[in-house]
C-alpha cells in the first residue's frame, strides 16, 4: 500500500513540474581567438577573468637551458651518461667494427655481379648486359644540335627556333668543341697541344 502511494506521488510531481525545453531563440556564444587570449593571457599566473576563484598554478620558474647544458647532459651518445639523471638506464651495445675503403672494395667489388662476401645469401641483381655504344652511335643519334633529330627517339621534342637562335650565339664554342674532340689526343695536356694556334688557323 505504501509503495503504491509513493509511486502515485512521484507521477503527480512529474506532471506538476514540466521538463524545461531550450529556448530556440537562444544562440550559444561563439568563441574567438581573442576570447582565448583574453581568458588565458598568461600560462604562468593563469589569471582567468571569467573564473576569478579558480585556483592559480603556483610553480617555480624553470631554469633557462643553454646549449652548454645540453652538451653537459648528453655529452656522449655511446655511453649516454646524464649527470641530471644518474639512474637512467644506459644503452648497452657492442662497438661497431671500423670500416675502411678496403672493406668497401672487398664487399662491393663488382656492381655487375654484386657478390658480397659479408652477405652471401643476398639476392643478386639479374639484368641483361647493355648494348655497347660507340662514338659512331652517338654521331648517328645526335647528328645535329640545332634540330636534335634522333632516329632512336623520333618522338622526342625537337628544339624550337628560339633554341636555334640561342645556339647560334654559342656557335664559336661548339666549333671549338668539335675541333678539340677531333684533333686533341686523349690524355694530352695543354703543354702538348697549342690549342689557340690551331683553333685560330
Curated annotation (Swiss-Prot):
The keyword Lipoprotein does not apply. GO terms for molecular function: mating pheromone activity. Its main location: secreted. Glycans are attached at residues 187, 194. Keywords: Cell cycle, Cleavage on pair of basic residues, Glycoprotein, Pheromone, Repeat, Secreted, Signal. One of its GO terms (biological process) is signal transduction involved in positive regulation of conjugation with cellular fusion. Residues 1-20 form the signal peptide. It is found in: Secreted. Proteolytically cleaved by kpr, probably at the C-terminal side of dibasic Lys-Arg residues. Glycosylated. Most of the precursor molecules are glycosylated on at least one site, but only a small proportion are glycosylated on both sites. GO terms for cellular component: cell surface; extracellular region. Residues 21-31, 58-65, 92-99, 126-133, 160-201 form a propeptide. The Pro-P-factor precursor carries 4 repetitive units. The second and fourth units generate the major form of the P-factor in the cell. The first and the third units encode slightly different peptides, the fate of which is unclear. In h- cells under nutritional starvation, P-factor induces alteration of cell morphology toward mating, arrest of the cell cycle at the G1 phase prior to the initiation of DNA synthesis and indirect transcriptional activation of the sxa2 gene which down-regulates the signaling pathway. This is Pro-P-factor.
